Amino acid sequence: MERYGSITTPVSVPRLIVGAMLAAGVAVLILAFTQYGLLAGLAVSVIPAALCILWVTLRNPAISMLGLFVVNYFIMALTRYAHDLPFGMILDALIFYNFLIITLQALIRPIEWKRASSGLTVVAAIWMAYCILEIVNPESVSVAGWFSSVRSIAFYFFFIVVLTQLTMTEYKYLKYMLAVWSVLTLIAVGKACMQKFFGFNAAENYWLFVLGGRSTHIIHSGVRYFSFFSDAANFGGSMGLSMVVFSISALYYRNSWMKLYLLLVAAAACYGMLISGTRSALAVPFVGYSAFIMMSRNIKMIGAGVFLIIAAFIFLKFTTIGQGNSIIRRARSAFNTNDPSFQVRLANQAKLRELMADKPFGAGLGHGGGKAKTFAPNAALSQIPTDSWFVMVWVETGVVGILLHIGILLYILARGAYLVVFKLRNTQLRGF
């Protein structure tokens, strides 16, 4: 006899009871619309859909995680259209919902909690603890600033690490995630193409010309397209990652149509990365492909890969071929140390070094870059753009924080490489 029951076990319900429940539901819906108005009626009408979602995610928590993945992909776009909605709270609620689903699952069937007791969880917890302690940073002048940043910079990292290990427990879920991710990538590139060929919509124009996005997205070298991401830097970096993941995945899919589809997605992502005008995004494919080549341990692949990477570098760094094309010209500027925008970044970092000299633990979470003007409008650090993620982490958490952050990333890279090279036996999952 099974010790644990199953929420997927079919249940026989008399048709009379089903009919009575449906009739009662319709009656409640009509009452809500007629007596309490449109909003009440709409609220009642979504209850069946909510119950269906609850049932489906209880049966398979991985679906709930994929839902969180999709919502997180689009949440940045929604902030551009509805400024007053608490979108951070939406992500908080969805993360809480995923933990609730796992907790309910544990009441019915055993959960392998030990899956979450990995080194990745430990380093994520260390980073979260450091960021929590930033609340007592003497340089910080606003608890609200700390609270606004600690969730995205620390809490989400830790919670997603734990949830992923507890829910994405089978190889098929990785395939599902790749499929969903590929569709999201195509949508993102499609939106960027709409911006390029048809122009920006009213909300995007407001962000560009009223809220100040123009200064960094309509520049001397052309327009930097950002799709529905928060800015072109995030869009370009995301597309660079998508390009690497899907091009490598295409090599090891047995289905020819799937290979072709993934290559097309990778090509679309490459185009999206280029039209974003984000020079730093070019580092993603260079580093990603280099890491893959080094781990492959295949002499032919190493030789071909090294040749292609060097050829691409020489093409962009030492030639002027295709210089008349704005996309190639902008990509080539990533290797030009005399580029005006690069010089501006260096100047900003020089100013930041002077201000950060006596702040080993940083200025406090939420106190770096333009967003800091909300909490410390007159602070010197609030007037200088951070320009990149790593500079922002350095400014907000100090040299101690940035060294810890980089150390954690290097650990994740090294541990992941070790597992892929020496532990995985599935060639399709391993990638070589």
Residue positions per predicted region:
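A conserved mid-to-late transmembrane alpha helix and its immediate loop/hinge
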Residues: S227, D231-A233, C270, P360, ...
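Aromatic-anchored transmembrane helix interface
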Residues: I90-Y97, G119-A129, V143-L166, A179-V180, ...
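Long extracytoplasmic/lumenal interhelical loops at the membrane interface
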Residues: I219, Q323-T397, Y418-K423
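Transmembrane signal-anchor hairpin modules in multi-pass inner-membrane enzymes, especially those
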Residues: M1-L133, K172-K175, A179, R254-L260, ...
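Alpha-helical transmembrane segments of multi-pass inner-membrane proteins
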Residues: E2-S6, P14-R15, A24-G25, A49-C52, ...
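Hydrophobic transmembrane alpha-helices and their immediate junctions
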Residues: S256-K259, S290-I293, T397-F432
